[in-house]
Amino acid sequence: MSPSDVPINWKRNLTVTWLGCFLTGAAFSLVMPFLPLYVEQLGVTGHSALNMWSGLVFSITFLFSAIASPFWGGLADRKGRKIMLLRSALGMAIVMLLMGMAQNIWQFLILRALLGLLGGFIPNANALIATQVPRHKSGWALGTLSTGGVSGALLGPLAGGLLADHYGLRPVFFITASVLFICFLLTFFFIHENFLPVSKKEMLHVREVVASLKNPRLVLSLFVTTLIIQVATGSIAPILTLYVRELAGNVSNIAFISGMIASVPGVAALLSAPRLGKLGDRIGPEKILIVALIISVLLLIPMSFVQTPWQLALLRFLLGAADGALLPAVQTLLVYNSTNQIAGRIFSYNQSFRDIGNVTGPLMGAAISASYGFRAVFCVTAGVVLFNAIYSWNSLRRRRLAIE
């Protein structure tokens, strides 16, 4: 029996990759609460300079990730997804360790860029599971896997803030590096993949990848959908705390209220993603995607008219429940419309679009709020998501007509 014929325990792989995504999500978000404080500790002074450098060290990771993702995706299709998971976890662990030793802002900026270059654990985990799980369970499996990163991202800032208060800023980077090394060990010992390496000559070029797709136009529309989902999420991030303060008035626990309102969509997505993924397996992920986008529009508009923080919290919880269906539905449709041979590259291209959205979303939100106020951000974001819903519906309708 050849290695590729050995049966894979995909359920165990799903469990271990979920843990890996949880640890990676936690590791990335552990340092987020105090990133501007660390920038200040590295010698940056003055309000405008601190804002500029904080924005740079935050966004440069996503920019370099967007650039590097297609390369790593191609390598994953040649060498296998497990080795890419190991490369990512170990590489990020080393970079996090070095971040704790940075002596000036330029060193830190370069290391943040390197973190983006070496990242990619979660998209490779998605590609691994997508190629192993039975197709009729893709929605449930990818929805479940998405909750790993969400859970880690929710707990990370809380843990990072507590650790920074007790031990200082630099030790948190060392703790984060340890968490990522644990992720490396879990992947090394417990994830199994039957993969026959492909020579560079046998690899499909970009044109051949596009030609091998069942519906290239639909796949491109799914990439655009991923970008817009991240733009919509990120556009609200820069103004959320300030908007909550405007709604709450002069209260002493504004940080707690803002933190809670920031986290409730993640909690809702955690609860909804596996269930909506399973529903998508039954009725079709395209229906879940369109309905979730329309619900998102209907929830974003009233956010610009709320009068209290609790009204905003309720709407954001409902929005999170809808958002929990979006990326897993996109990923499931990508699985349906591509082959295992090119899964690594398809998921890495999708990650690049996601990273671009992570950069442009906050910039859009900040620009709109500066010109038209906080409430306008929600209306414009609703308009962007509505465009996405119409665009996605049209792309999916064309696919259905082509099949008929």
From Swiss-Prot:
Gene3D superfamilies: MFS general substrate transporter like domains. It is a multi-pass membrane protein. PANTHER family: MULTIDRUG RESISTANCE PROTEIN MDTG (PTHR43414:SF6). This is Multidrug resistance protein MdtG. Its main location: membrane. GO terms for molecular function: transmembrane transporter activity. It is found in: Cell inner membrane. SUPFAM superfamilies: MFS general substrate transporter (SSF103473). Keywords: Cell inner membrane, Cell membrane, Membrane, Transmembrane, Transmembrane helix, Transport.
